[in-house]
Each structure stands twice: as structure tokens, then as C-alpha cells.
Amino acid sequence: MSSAVLSPDRYINRELSWIAFNQRVLAQALDQRTPLLDQAKFSAIFSNNLDEFFMVRVASLKSQVEAGITTPSEDGKTPLEQLLTIRERLIPLLQQQQDHYRKQLRKKLLDHNVQLLDYSQLNKHQQQWVSDTFRHSVFPVLTPLAVDPAHPFPFVSNLSLNVAAVIHDPESGQRQFARVKVPQKNLPRFVSIPTELSESDPKPIHTAVPLEQVIAFNLDLLFPGMSVQGHYFFRVTRDADLELRDLEADDLMLALEQGLRKRRMGGEVVRLEVPNDMPEDVVEMLMNGLAVEEEDLYRIDGPLGLDDLFGLMALPLPKLKDKQHSGQTPTVLARTQQHLIDEGAIKPEEFESIFSVMRQQDILLHHPYDLFSTTVEEFINQAADDPQVMGIKMTLYRTSKDSPIIAALIRAAENGKQVMALVELKARFDEDNNIQWARQLERSGVHVVYGVLGLKTHTKIVLVVRKEQEKLRSYVHIGTGNYNSKTSKLYTDLGLLSTRPELGQDLVELFNYLTGFSKQQSFRRLLVAPVTLRKGMESLIRREIEHAREGRDGHIRAKMNSLVDPDIIALLYEAAAANVRVELIIRGMCSLYPGREGLSESISVVSIIGQFLEHSRIFWFGNGGSPEVYIGSADWMSRNLDRRVEAVTPVEDPNLRGRLERLLELYLKDNRGAWDMQSDGSFIQRQPEDGEDVRNSQVQLIKQWSQGVPQS
């Protein structure tokens, strides 16, 4: 467990570090070098990230304040002080986002004949079409709810967009309120209008108006006989974190389902978003009805819920998007694709099973540059159909809908193989999906387990056991990312395919640890949390310190999502004091101060934000000239090291190790998506020097793969 106590001047608050990360995401939207529709995408990601941050992190801090907890975080801030600072940091970012939407995005889309219009900008023909559409496609699903002494304040669901209508009763003379929920789950946020109705010349490629405005300007149909005096939009965010204590739940699935029902009904409101021009009496009515305080209120200068800008990526305008990368099949696996026989691309006698290739060498996969479908999915598909395969075991943390991997596991069970799937039911915001997969797998004869009591299983591992010449051989995949067909195209992740006996035996014992009563305390090659990973990582860092103290080169390079563990940070400061060179590539939260005189002068931190979400974890240690490199599922966070099951594997093939070393070098030289962390914790985006070529690491990797997938 983490035990280091760092003074506030040595530790950056994790919540504020997260906001700095999301600010870098927003910067991608504001950067005019980013293609226009990708600007919309990054703005949507910024909003979506912020929703989850409020639902989990802000909700947790508010709960602490309500419980009277004043214990400071590692940087010396109480929960209340953190909440106030979060608000202070967010308000200017939200204004930047709205300014970009209004002054940049909409105007520049118009230059490309894409019209995102307000209702007031529609011509009479468009308004008539919208009114007709409202009557037959929107009106029937709306439910206006009155707010008065006879009608209690209606429940407002999490992340819902709503219309607050101000109604005047001509008979009584009373001014009343009503709430109408915008049916976003049933209808698109932006209503497409036939382009031929436009009076523009040339005709637009796409014309749309926000659904909430369509509803607002037709409220008279919802309140016949009444006078609609005004309408105002509002959006609510609720506490959505599930508090699950395994020891209190005999049936984890039942407990989760109850928790999910509670989440859908909604926890306490943690954020209320309203437009700047909402009258104070309407604001007061909402605040009282939703039981929110002034610090929970965010006044927004523009449309609410900009996460819906994701929908613009569907527009058929490739010139306004980053060039799409379809991925490649590694050359070494080119003849392992069953579909090539069906398509006549190779002869049946030319086919080579993926198992045959794995017996000859370790294979390093790098997604999305390497196709997930022709590598990891093909591995599991061939295992499901191969008569010599006796069993398949794997962990599932987040998988996609209509998952080919789930289908393969079911087929394997139907083919008589022993199949075990560890489905992590507690994967946040994927719980419902995972419950459905678990039930489907169980019905098909797959042994389904839910992991170790009190721990979340985050490791990404597959074990295939195959009978060969009366002996059993283990084939393994150990990765950094989820077995998810969709995110494999959006996230960068690494995976190792191997038949090394020690790795195979380690996975056999790790799965026994996950499914039985094993108290395994050591592994041959793997570093496993919560058993050996923390000790192993600390030992590797200390070894670099010893190398440096004895006059050899001490050098650490590590790439991960987040670095917030106090013990690891304290040890890295100790490494810096010994003059170990520490180069960190941290996409998200980083609580360490780099480059501080007398503390961390030899430590540098860079963050890469690009077309793909950087998700791979790599740990490289110079070891006095005999480097060792590891990949796996864990960040340097207390939860990964102590409260989750994680697996990190050494990459022992010299060629593959060299590939990873060159990959780290490529990231460190990036001058397009890279942000350098300063000694005060702020970030500055790198820019090419005059005459210097732009080095975008992700674009360079796409180019490398298009010219032939690296094999060594």
C-alpha cells in the first residue's frame, strides 16, 4: 500500500491535474491545425470527459464535504477547497469551448456548406417543415410536467437536457412553470432539415437545428389555452458512482443490478447547467427543486451538452477529418487469415495457423496500426475452432456490443472446449453491458467468474491451452488494452503473443488465483498486482538508483496514462537526487513536479494528445547498459498497484525490445501532439522550430505501417 507522505510542494492535486489534461484535450479543438470536424470531436470529448469527472470525482468530494471530512489531500487541500478550485479552473475553459463553437466551428462549417442553425435562422419553409416534423415525430413522445403546489418537482434524470417553460394562465392570471424532457435517447440531438428547403446558393450539404429548439418553439402545442412566456434549457448531472462492498453482497450481480437501478434513478445532483440569460426566479426554482447550491450552478454562454457534437463526425466530408487509418495485418501473420482462403487470396496449402507462427517467435502487436480483428480476434477465433485446443481462459473488462470475441468464446464452448471468462462486472459505466454478456456466456456453457473478492480485475490476458504430441502447450496474449473491437480502432495499445513456457505457467497460476482460493505470492516472469507489481516496480527503480550511485548510467523511460501514487513519486524524486535520468510520457494525470531545482532536475514529463487516445503502458529500465522493458495494464496509481488485479510482462525478444525502445524515442521527439510539463505543473505545447519538420508520432506510425508493418 502507498505510505509516502509528500509535502504539498512536492505533489500536484490529482483532480487539478486531471483538469489540466482535459484542458489539453480542449486545446486540440481550439487548435486551427486540427481538421474542422475533428475540432468538433475533441470538443465533444472534452464535454464527455467532464460529465464523467462530475459524476465520479466531484460527487466523491461533495460526499466528503457533506460528511464533514476535512482531511487534506496530499497537496494540502481539503475536499471543500478542492471543489472551489475545480470550479475556478473550469469556468474559463467552458467559456473557451463556447466561444470556439460560436465564433469558429459554426462559422467555418458554414464555409463548407454545413449549416448548424438556430430556429430563429430558419426560413418560413424550413420552419414549416420543422413544425410538421415536430407534430408527427416529436410531440407524441413528450411529457410536460407541471411544477406547482399540486405537482411536486419532477425527477430530472442524469445528463438529461430539459426545457423549463414559463406559462401564463389567462384565466387565473398566474405565472407557472413546467418541465419538458428532451428525448435524446429516442431522437437525434440535431434535427436534419432537407437541404432543398434552403434559400442559400449553393445549396448546403447539410442543414440541422437543435432538437431542444424545435421543442421550445412549438411549446404552444403542448400547452393549449395557455400563453408561453418563455423557455430556458437546463441540464443536470448526478452522482453516478456505485458504492459496492463485496462482503455485504452474497450475489454481486444482484447487488450491481440494484446499484444500476439506483444510478438510473439518480444520486444527488452535483451540477446544474443553465444558460446565461435564464431569469433569476427560474434559476431559483430549479435550484430549490433540485437541492443544489450556488457552487453547483454553471451558467453557460451557449448550447448545453456539447458531447453531442460527436454526431458531426458522421458527415461525409473526409477533407474535414484526420485521414482515417484502417490498420494492417502484421506481415508475420499474413498467411494466418482463414478468410483469405475463402476469398481465393491464398491456397489452402499456403495457410499457416496462428499457433504455428507463435511457436516460432514472440509477436508484438501495436493497435490500431495493427488490426485487432486479424490479430487478437483471429487468435481467439482459431482457438475456438481448432480441435487440438483444450481450453481458453480470458479476462473481459470492457468489450464491444456485438463482440466477435464473445461469439468466439460461445462457439468454443459449443465445440466442447473448457472455456472460462472472467467478466469484471464493476467496470465503471460498463456494468450493465457486462452483466448481459456474463449471462449470455453462462447460458452457452462458458464458466463465468467475477474475480477476486475486494479487487477489480483490470488485467488483459488470454490463455489458450493446446494439445500437441501428447503434451500441453500454452499460448498467451498479454495486453495493455481492452478486448474491444470498437476502442481498438481509437486507442493505442500494445499486446504480446507468446508461447514462452514461463509466461504460460504464470498465466495458469494467475487464472487459478482469479478463479479459486489460490494465495499465489510469486510469479516467474509476470509482475502481478496486488501481489508483486508494486515491489517489482520499486525494485526496478531502485536498481537504476544503484547504477547511478555506482557511476553507471541510470535511466528510466516510462509511458502510461496516469502517475499519482505517492510512493512511486517519492522514489522517482530519490532517483533524480541520484542523477538518474527519468523520461516520462504521461497522457493524463501527473502529480509529480518535473525539472525542479534540488528536487527533480533530471525528470522530464511529456503528454501526447492526438488522433488516437494514447493508452499503452511501457516501462523501460536502462539497467546499466542491459535494458529491460515491460508492457501491461497498470498505471502508476495506488488503485492499479494495490486494489486491482493487473499483469505486466517483460518483453524479452531483443528485436521486440528494440521496437519498443524506438517507439519511446519517437514519442519523446514528437513536436505536434506533445506537451511539455513545466516545473510549476503547467504544460506548454511543443512547436516545431523554424525550418524544423513537424514530427507527429501518430502520423509517423501510420506512415511506417503503410510502408510495411515493423517486424523488428
Swiss-Prot record:
InterPro entries recorded: PP_kinase, PP_kinase_C_1, PP_kinase_middle, PP_kinase_middle_dom_sf, PPK_C_dom2, PPK_N_dom, PPK_N_dom_sf
GO cellular component terms, A-Z: polyphosphate kinase complex
Catalytic activity: [phosphate](n) + ATP = [phosphate](n+1) + ADP
Cofactor: Mg(2+)
Enzyme Commission number(s) of this protein: 2.7.4.1
CDD domains (alphabetical): PLDc_PaPPK1_C1_like, PLDc_PaPPK1_C2_like
EC category: transferase
Residues where ATP binds: N49, Y491, R587, H615
Mod. after translation: An intermediate of this reaction is the autophosphorylated ppk in which a phosphate is covalently linked to a histidine residue through a N-P bond.
Residues where Mg(2+) binds: R398, R428
GO molecular function: ATP binding; metal ion binding; polyphosphate kinase activity
Cystine pairs: none
Keywords, ordered alphabetically: ATP-binding, Kinase, Magnesium, Metal-binding, Nucleotide-binding, Phosphoprotein, Repeat, Transferase
GO biological process: polyphosphate biosynthetic process
Positions annotated as active site in the UniProt record: H458 (phosphohistidine intermediate)
Family under the similarity heading: Belongs to the polyphosphate kinase 1 (PPK1) family.
Cross-referenced PANTHER family: POLYPHOSPHATE KINASE
Reported function: Catalyzes the reversible transfer of the terminal phosphate of ATP to form a long-chain polyphosphate (polyP).
The protein's name: Polyphosphate kinase
